[in-house]
Swiss-Prot record:
Coiled coil: none annotated. Pathway: Purine metabolism; AMP biosynthesis via de novo pathway; AMP from IMP: step 1/2. GO terms for cellular component: cytoplasm. It comes from Neisseria gonorrhoeae (strain ATCC 700825 / FA 1090). Homodimer. This is Adenylosuccinate synthetase. Plays an important role in the de novo pathway of purine nucleotide biosynthesis. Catalyzes the first committed step in the biosynthesis of AMP from IMP. It comes from the Bacteria. The gene is purA. NCBIfam families: PRK01117.1 (NF002223), purA (TIGR00184).
Length: 432
């Protein structure tokens, strides 16, 4: 019997993880964010009301449910408190009482944001597409062992000494490499002194609490951010995020042993999207792509940036299934494909020199040279919006899902036919 479930994005992010985590949270005893920062939004729609979460786990809307931010997450205290205030204003109960933050979480502070934005501006046409929220520099500090972490908020007398050393490093870069102004220690301390009284009570030994919950038989839900193809190691590098987005990162990022991860649910959009720069073999530049973007409301929930749209890429998904050990797939936004007369599925790529491959190559340069090989299927005219039974889906929609299973080599467990929590078809429940 599966007890703990990891939910990850199996493409380039924006697959609809938030809705599915919110839906699964009904049966969970705790929901955990284990990587990323506030650079991506998870959108939930409950009873027609939309909520966008960036740092707080998507289970927070369930009254009484404990939520956790593991040490793999880089936390902006200001963004976190802003999100809490939004939830409080919306009537969500006891947010601060139910949210626990690992003491080992690196903090995102003003100098991270300043350097992130200065670097991106300096890249010119070579921009990576960072959100400019300081995520990358914060992860750099973690690896370089100079991060200011959540636990440091409990010891302000030592924090100032650490801050002075960090700013000496940052201001050299800002002033001499990027021709930007320095960040003042007094300004950073003002932020810290403002947020510390509210953040400190939420700091807890997340790893210990999660392991205790597991021993007590409570189901745990691990919520990933971004997508596997943006992973710092296995994504289309350098056009990737700064963290490990794979299912395996749930263990280290939450502080639990890998034996506690029973089921990996890969969230997969019924077509493919990507935000920002980077190779995208199946990208569409015609009216079909424009139609997907319009019907799918393909704009970033945090940045507002338009997402690039393309055909379903089964070869890319194969890579994701391989590196995540995906147990089952949740296909989202099936309803956006309604009315597309002819559908293409990318089943592989032609390579320079005449070769072929049925799986996404590693690295951006290799992917850039790939030419998609398509299979064509008939679409469907009937509406799938809000359909809650697999048998009620159009025959061609079911054939599309079946072909995705066959080409990718993983079963479809869930189908989402709309943004609301209830617009969901369950073929196999991950917690079953």
């Amino acid at each position: 019997m599966a007890k703990n479930v990891v939910v990850i994005g199996a493409q380039w992010g924006d697959e609809g993880k938030g809705k599915i985590v919110d839906w699964l949270a009904e049966e969970a005893g705790g929901v955990v964010r284990f990587q990323g920062g506030h650079n991506a939004g998870h959108t939930l729609v409950v009873g027609g009301k939309k909520t966008i979460l960036r740092l707080i786990p998507s289970g927070i809307l369930h009254e009484g449910l404990d939520c956790f931010i593991g040490s793999g997450v880089v936390v902006s205290p200001e963004a976190l408190l802003g999100e809490i205030d939004e939830l409080n204003a919306a009537g969500v109960k006891n947010v601060e009482g139910r949210l626990k933050i690992a003491p080992t979480c690196p903090l995102i502070l003003p100098y991270h944001i300043a350097l992130d934005q200065a670097r991106e501006a300096s890249r010119g046409k070579g921009k990576i597409g960072t959100t400019g929220r300081g995520i990358g520099p914060a992860y750099e500090d973690k690896v370089a062992r100079r991060a200011i972490r959540a636990a440091d908020l409990l010891h302000p007398e030592k924090l100032r000494e650490k801050l002075d050393a960090v700013l000496a490093y940052y201001n050299v870069q800002l002033q001499y490499l990027h021709n930007a102004g320095p960040v003042k220690a007094e300004d950073v301390m003002a932020v810290i002194e403002k947020v510390a009284p509210r953040i400190a009570p939420m700091i807890a030994d997340v790893s210990r609490v999660l392991n205790e919950k597991n021993k007590n038989g409570e189901k745990l839900l691990f919520e990933g951010a971004q997508g596997a193809l943006l992973d710092i190691d296995y994504g289309t590098y350098p056009f990737v995020t700064s963290s490990n987005c794979l299912a395996g990162a749930a263990s280290a990022g939450a502080g639990v042993g890998p034996q506690m991860l029973d089921y990996v649910l890969g969230i997969v959009k019924a077509y493919t999207t990507r935000v920002g720069s980077g190779p995208f073999p199946t990208e569409l530049f015609d009216e079909v792509g424009a139609g997907l973007a319009e019907r799918g409301h393909e704009f970033g929930s945090v940045t507002g940036r338009a997402r690039r749209c393309g055909w379903f890429d089964a070869a890319a998904l194969k890579r994701s299934i391989q590196i995540n050990g995906i147990s089952g797939m949740c296909i989202t936004k099936l309803d956006v494909m309604d009315g597309v007369e002819t559908i293409n599925i990318c089943v592989g790529y032609e390579l320079p020199g005449g070769g072929k491959t049925d799986i996404l190559p590693c690295g951006s340069d290799a992917v850039e040279t790939c030419k998609p090989i398509y299979e064509t299927m008939p679409g469907w005219r009937e509406s799938t919006v809000g359909v809650k039974s697999y048998d009620a889906l159009p025959a061609n929609a079911k054939a599309y899902l079946k072909r995705i299973e066959e080409v990718c080599g993983a079963p479809v467990a869930i189908v989402s036919t709309g943004p609301d929590r209830e617009e969901t078809i369950v073929l196999h429940h991950p917690f079953a």
